[in-house]
């Protein structure tokens, strides 16, 4: 049984733990014991994961970013009267370090100079969730960052410390991006009418 793409929050998507994602498959290939442990243990996002989520939200759901995030003022001191007042007004938001404001500006300039800017130039949808009850005997899911309306183009944004061809090639192997790409293509082949051309 195949499900058509669904619109849901990131939290709802990750809450569907009966379905395997590319992340869980990569864990199985790396360490089956860690995979089984993570299935039952409470997940605590690392700082890198939280920053990655912020970057994705900035580029893909900018209005949501404005509602959920804020930047800590430079030379912030939470012990002062002004600092305490600022925390009272912004404590309900996800607070990013002051330098992240400038980082995102530089990232945006780089992004607009890359092929990934197609997400602004072509019709498509962000953060759609795809589910399959039987992907080779596995309940599967995937959530591409962006997919074109004709399903011919899929974009998944990645942050990296080294954007050179050699540096990013190393990241591909280190983080299993090639496995993720294959998983996404297979999921979309099963769940999207136009995905034959994509895969």
Where are these regions (language model features)?
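Short, contiguous acidic/charged loop-to-helix segments that flank catalytic cores in large enzymes
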Residues: 168-175
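Hydrophobic/aromatic-lined pockets within catalytic cores
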Residues: 59-64, 159-162, 189
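Single conserved hydrophobic/aromatic residue that forms the stacking wall/gate
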Residues: 190-199
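Metal-dependent nuclease catalytic cores that hydrolyze phosphodiester bonds in DNA/RNA
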Residues: 1-142
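An active-site-proximal "capping" alpha-helix that borders the catalytic cofactor pocket
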Residues: 178-187
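Conserved catalytic cores of phosphodiester-cleaving nucleases, focusing on short active-site segments
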Residues: 144-167
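Secondary-structure boundary elements
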Residues: 116-120, 148-154, 188-190
């Amino acid at each position: 049984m195949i499900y058509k793409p669904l619109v849901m929050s990131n939290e709802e998507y990750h809450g569907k733990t009966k379905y395997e994602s590319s992340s869980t498959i990569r864990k199985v290939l790396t360490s089956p014991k860690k995979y089984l442990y993570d299935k039952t243990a409470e997940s605590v996002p690392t700082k890198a994961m939280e920053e990655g989520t912020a970057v994705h939200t900035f580029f893909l759901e900018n209005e949501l970013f404005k509602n959920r995030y804020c930047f800590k003022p430079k030379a912030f001191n939470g012990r002062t009267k002004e600092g305490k007042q600022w925390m009272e007004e912004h404590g309900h938001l996800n607070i990013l370090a002051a330098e992240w404001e400038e980082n995102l500006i530089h990232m945006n300039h780089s992004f607009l100079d890359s092929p990934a800017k197609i997400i602004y130039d072509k019709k498509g949808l962000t953060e759609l969730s795809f589910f399959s009850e039987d992907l080779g005997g596995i309940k599967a899911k995937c959530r591409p960052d962006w997919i074109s309306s004709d399903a011919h183009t899929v974009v998944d944004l990645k942050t990296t410390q080294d954007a050179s061809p050699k540096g990013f090639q190393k990241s591909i192997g280190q983080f299993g991006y090639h496995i993720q790409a294959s998983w996404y293509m297979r999921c979309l082949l099963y769940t999207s009418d136009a995905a034959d051309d994509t895969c």
